[in-house]
Amino acid sequence: MIPTTTVTGRLQHRSGLPVQGMVRFTPSRLWVVRDNITWACLAPETRLAADGSFSVQVTPTDTDPIWWRYMIETPAGWWEVSVPHNAAGQTLRGLIGEHHPGSRAAQ
């Protein structure tokens, strides 16, 4: 079985109020191959909690020899990121910071 990685985050406006709406993770690759078995990539979509937080399971982008990424769409903006496997999980802020250093509203 292909491992999954949990991605968590919290989105808030500059005023500190939580962002409301949906978060969508769209993989650039529909399938990955591991040990000669083809697996569908997870493409989760979830509603932000009242405090602007979310948690989803995704297919890590480093489990296949072909390079691919996720597009993460939120009411606060969108990002294209790699999601390496990490049993402890990943944060949206960490994924965004890895590709776009600097201050961001996501946590």
Name each region found by the language model:
Residues 1-86:
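Beta-strand-dominated extracellular/periplasmic modules and repeats
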Residues 86-107:
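Extracellular beta-sheet/turn segments enriched in Thr/Pro/Gly and aliphatic residues
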